[in-house]
Each structure stands twice: as C-alpha cells, then as structure tokens.
Amino acid sequence: MYVSRLLLFLAPLLVKGQLSGSVGPLTSVSSKSQTKTCNVLDYGAVADKSTDIGPALSSAWDECADGGVVYIPPGDYAIETWVKLSGGKACAIQLDGIIYRTGTDGGNMIMIEHTSDFEFFSSTSKGAFQGYGYEFHAKGSSDGPRILRLYDVSDFSVHDVALVDSPLFHFSMDTCSNGEVYNMAIRGGNMGGLDGIDVWSTNVWIHDVEVTNKDECVTVKSPSKNILVENIYCNWSGGCAMGSLGTDTDISDIVYRNVYTWKSNQMYMVKSNGGSGTVSNLVLENFIGHGNAYSLDIDSAWSSMSTIEGDGVELKNVTIRNWKGTEADGSQRGPIKVKCASGAPCTDVTVEDFAMWTESGDEQTYVCENAFGDGFCLADGDGTSTFTTTLTASAAPSGYSAPSMDADLETAFGTDSEIPIPTIPTSFYPGATPYSALAGASVSSSQVPAASSSAEAKFVASPATSSPTATSTAISSVDPVSAATTTATSHGHGKSHHKHQCRAHRH
C-alpha cells in the first residue's frame, strides 16, 4: 500500500474524537508518474511570470486526471484564468514552481472536485501561490478570488506548499474525506476574511501548519466529523476556531492538540448566535498562548454574527486540558469565557490543568454562563437551570509559564504591500517534532518529477493526553527514487497545578 497512506491500527482502542480510518492517497506519486507525467510546459505554459498557466494546467489535467502526475517545474508562472479540475482518480499535482495571480475574477484560482486518490504537493517544499491580495486590500476591497478549494475529494493529501496573500480565503476543504494536510505555511494580510484553513469534512488530519493572517487559523465548520488538528502555529493570526455555527449544526469527534498561538484574536473560539444542532466530543488540549486578546472563548451570542433563528447550538462532552501561557489583558478579556445559550446549555464540560495569567494588570476574570461541568466557573448540574458566574483571580496561578517560538513575528503583515513567500518551517509547537520531514529536505537541486515526499505513519493507540507516534518514510523525487527514513514523536507537556484567589459573583 502507498507509503503516504496513514494506517490506523488497533481501531477499537483509538481515542474518541481522533480519526475514524486511514487518510491520504492510495497510490504513490512514483506509481502515478510511471503511468503518465504531464509537464505543463508541454501544454503551453511558460515560466515567464506573464503567460497564463491556466489553460496549460487544465489541458495537462485532462491528460493525467485518470492516472498520472501533472508537473509544474521550478520557475515563475502567472495565472490569469482560474481552473476547475474535475473528476479523475490516482492523480497528483506536483507544484515545484511559484504561481502568481494576475487575474482579477472572483471564485477559486484552483478548484479540485469529485476526485479520489489525489495528492497536491511540492517535492522541493518550495512550491507556492502568491495571491497578491494587497492589490485588492490596499483599495479597501474585500473582493477577489480564493487560492485553493477542494470539494468532494477523498483519499488525498496536500503538503509542502506555501499559500501567500490570498485576496480572500487561502484553503478550504468542503465535503471531503480521508485527507491529510501537513508541512504548510499560509501567510495573509492583517484583516478579516483571509481565512487560513477551513474544513467541513470527515476524517481529516491537519498537522504541522503555520498560519499568519487576522482571521481563521485552522477552523472546523459544519458538518464535520473525526477531525484531528495537531502541531499548529498561529503566528499573529485570528486563531483557531469552530464556526460560525448556524442552523442544524452537526459536528462531532474533533481534537485539537498542540496549538501554539501568538498575538492573535484568540487561542480557540466557538462562535454562534442562535441556530440549532449539536457539537459533541470536542477536545482542546496542549495549548500555549502569548499576547492574545482572548484565550478560551465559547460565545453563543457572538455579536459579529447576525442572530439566527433557533434556541442555540448545544455543546456537550467538551474537554479543555493543559493550557498554559499569558493573555494580553485578563481584566478586560479573561482567559476563560464559556457563555452558552439558555435554550441550549453546554453540558459535560471539563476544564483542567489550565494555568494562564495576564500580561497587563494584576487580575483576570473567568466567566461562565449556562455552562455545566467541572472546573473554574462551570456549575454542577444537567443544564436544566440558568446562571451566570464571574470569578476574579488576583494572583497568578502556578505553572502558567510557557515557552515561546523563535519565529514569533514582531509585527503583522499589512494590507498595502507585497507579502513575501516564506520558507516552510520545521517547528510548529514548542518541543514537538513534525510527523514528516519536509519533502525538500533530501532533494537535490537536479529535481525531476519522480516520486512523493509523503510518509507512511502508523498510529499507536494512546490516551487523549498523548500525541500519536508516527514513523515516516520520506521518498524524494530524485531519479532514481531514493528514500530516507525518519521517526518522529510529538511530545506533550506535563500537567501543571494552579491556585487562585478568587471572588465569585453569580447572577
């Protein structure tokens, strides 16, 4: 079976909320390329940063969609007309060049739909999209295209590419299944509407990704099930989130683990305002934050969202575990806010090993409303009553100190000048080794399209507080194919204890 296919053994023992089955392509890029390789240069593409690559990319896809590799060699390409690449099986797009937006239409620059056994990657880890979103944003416009969208794609991976300065969203996965996304850098402007990764899908593993923007970092939307998000670096971003949630919300079995958030809107937010449906079996563990406006922010009356008809979205069986670090101003925006609707209270919520402290002032607040469970301002009960509780802490909890990342940005990227294409990092969370080495780590400069950098990883069933151990076999695309084997284990952080001096006010 293909080496980039993630095999899940001991399935009955897997922790609830993790993946429900295998993820990733079914066949290797090496095998696909032996079937056929469609070099876009042979279909009219020119690496001159001005000739539209759109028609050549579409033609190459038509030739290789039923088995093969569409190869975009190193070089600078322009894209003026967007491409919708539909159908196909056992196919891949190997982006080793850089594609620069020159068109101005809305929509999606690249859309992949109704496809299975698919891989989108750079074998050098240097492939990128430059969206030049600042050309829209500097004029005050929030219009323009998105960069990459996958719709109804199964058994897939996206990795080792950078998505930069999209006029709108950078990357979305809509109604996809059995996917793996990793080793990516996403860099957008400092304004809303420039989402990093949005996913509403089933059985998807997103890991080892850095996002800079001012909106969603990695966000789960409805409907979604069995989404595992790990080793995420929100580096001056909007922060990770769930939502916005509306009518008939259906989200379950979601795990976020090892999330580092710096100078962002929040460390994690669940946002809704009215609506209906359920979010169940949510785990948020091993979070580190510094300088963020909000930390844990569950808000069922989010004022930035128009009110939707319904009693609210019900949250149940939610665990928040092992959060450390500091928030910008704990008296204005305390590190815990769990505000649930009276008609749809939150139940079975647990907050444990949570130690954060304010960077400004000498006190912070914890606010809970109609939220039932164990920890801090949560109330005992089954959700049949209503309440609001505010706790004020005037002493720092023990164990709140947490490491920072060397690559923390000193300032955000603006909206009126070009944003540089970054190098994909090799660290995404303090002390955690990425599950797969960068594809370009063992690739020579004499690059040819021959094989993938994807990796075989076998999950070992583990407690929810631990990250799975992955054994990765990286395959370079040098001809002849060569392999390098690395073993990577993601390390969790130990538990911390906290003591608070609090004043409680219940209404």
UniProtKB/Swiss-Prot annotation:
Record-level GO cellular component terms: extracellular region
Function recorded in the entry: Pectinolytic enzymes consist of four classes of enzymes: pectine lyase, polygalacturonase, pectin methylesterase and rhamnogalacturonase. Hydrolyzes alpha-D-galacturonopyranosyl-(1,2)-alpha-L-rhamnopyranosyl linkages in the backbone of the hairy regions of pectins. Active against linseed rhamnogalacturonan.
Signal sequence residues: 1-21
Sequence ranges of Basic residues compositional bias: 492-507
Active site as annotated: D215 (proton donor), H290
GO terms of biological process kind: cell wall organization; pectin catabolic process
Name of this chain's protein: Rhamnogalacturonase A
Keyword Signal: yes
EC number per UniProt: 3.2.1.171
Upper taxonomic lineage: Eukaryota, Fungi, Dikarya, Ascomycota, Pezizomycotina
Origin superkingdom: Eukaryota
Biased composition (Low complexity): 462-491
Alphabetically ordered keywords of this record: Carbohydrate metabolism, Cell wall biogenesis/degradation, Disulfide bond, Glycoprotein, Glycosidase, Hydrolase, Polysaccharide degradation, Secreted, Signal
Compartments where found: Secreted
Family: Belongs to the glycosyl hydrolase 28 family.
Spans annotated as Disordered: 462-507
Reactions this protein catalyses: Endohydrolysis of alpha-D-GalA-(1->2)-alpha-L-Rha glycosidic bond in the rhamnogalacturonan I backbone with initial inversion of anomeric configuration releasing oligosaccharides with beta-D-GalA at the reducing end
Enzyme class per UniProt: hydrolase
Cysteine-cysteine disulfides: C38-C64, C217-C234, C340-C346, C368-C377
Glycosylation sites: N235, N317
UniProt xrefs under Pfam families: Glyco_hydro_28, Pect-lyase_RHGA_epim
